[in-house]
Amino acid sequence: MINEFPEEYDNLDIDISIKHVVEGALASKLSGYFLIQNNKFSFSAVAFGRIGGHNINVKISKTTGDKIRKLNLDPEIVILIVQRKIIEGDITIQTKKQ
């Protein structure tokens, strides 16, 4: 697969954790966080998949975007990477302890 992200993002380590999922008939709502350089960033998302395959729409707050910019990263590119990782299953799903 061709990487469409700028070269400086090739070695960016992003760990994604899903904390909460609400499943629906057509879409699921997710919330969680991702870690970049020991910085924790919260997000919400809507995941769906029908004709055309799976898709996800990740949202972050303006404040979160500003914090990502302070790391000299483009929040739009970070969101695209997070979305791709979620679709590819490169995530941790947190479960409630019994």
Please describe what each predicted stretch is.
Residues I2-E8, D13, S42-Q98:
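Acidic, low-complexity intrinsically disordered segments
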